[in-house]
Amino acid sequence: MPDRLILLRPDDWHIHLRDGAALSRTVTDAARTFGRAIVMPNLVPPVRNASEAGAYRQRIQAARPADSRFEPLMTLYLTDKTSPEDIRTAKAQGFVHAAKLYPAGATTNSDAGVTRIDNIFPILEAMAEAGLPLLVHGEVTHSEVDVFDREKRFIDENLVRIIEHFPTLKVVFEHITTRDAVQFVETSSSNVGATITAHHLLYNRNHMLVGGIRPHFYCLPILKRRTHQEALLDAATSGNTKFFLGTDSAPHARHAKEAACGCAGCYTAYAAIELYAEAFEQRSALDRLEAFASHHGADFYGIPRNTDHITLIREEWTAPACMTFGEHSLVPLRAGEKLRWRLLEEKM
């Protein structure tokens, strides 16, 4: 196995940066590794139009470390009230790269999301015409559906319909967690891609539940059984261009995670590429990490690949037990544990 990896600088095609004082943490950590990142719009209130996206983009840019060229790629939050004109205006701005479908109530700050897929069919048509990709949080929210089955049900009830009705629409099935999702993406057209997180590659529901509940493994979509984890590893390391890096790094203050009703989300941005390297090394596939992290996503979005490089070295280091997060603190994934790869710090 190699002791050093030189990779074309990767991008993160799904990240939560939050807002306000949190940006000093999240933007710094993301910019350490990534050239660009697709920024999720689920703020309070959400980012619903080009004006709000532009203002949020400026706040992110202001939080970048000195001399950083990190580029936030903005997205819109789809609601039942989104209009085709919102889509056309956003596309024309040049800095909005996608729109996000959150089924109402599916995850953090999704209460303003779409209540019925049919409500946004005119919007999806406008997106297809404008060439604006659709990002999908693929879970149904019916109370009678088991939380471990929500992704499969979303495919059957919603995603199949979307793709059949809008075959020219680019769709990213985000943070996939099941063998069903892998198979769906593999057998769909080239307009359908998927992001995979490091934590879904490295962990399954046993890590979260066996021997005590570990709240910092709790995320949505929730960790699944090991057979699904294995399917994700197969997909990520296969070389299939439909699968690419998206951390879904989602920070919450420590008190909000370690609570009787804790928030969903794992914070991985501080060591994202190191965690992916561990996952790929499990499959003896480090030679395929660069394509997954640095090629496939940019190619899917039709954006030029980065031209600079990063270097990873095989060197153990200990993840911080706690990190500052605005006025609070957060506990990152793998807090206090050893990581096997380390990113050499270089300015972009």
Curated annotation (Swiss-Prot):
Signal in keyword set: no
Top EC category: hydrolase
Quaternary structure and partners: Homodimer.
Record protein name field: Dihydroorotase
Known EC number: 3.5.2.3
Keywords: Hydrolase, Metal-binding, Pyrimidine biosynthesis, Zinc
Catalytic activity: (S)-dihydroorotate + H2O = N-carbamoyl-L-aspartate + H(+)
Sites where the protein binds Zn(2+) 2: K100, H137, H175
Signal peptide: none
Entry function: Catalyzes the reversible cyclization of carbamoyl aspartate to dihydroorotate.
Binding site for substrate: H16, L17, R18, N42, H137, L220, H252, A264
Note on cofactor: Binds 2 Zn(2+) ions per subunit.
Species: Azotobacter vinelandii (strain DJ / ATCC BAA-1303)
Keyword Hydrolase: yes
Biological process according to GO: 'de novo' pyrimidine nucleobase biosynthetic process; 'de novo' UMP biosynthetic process
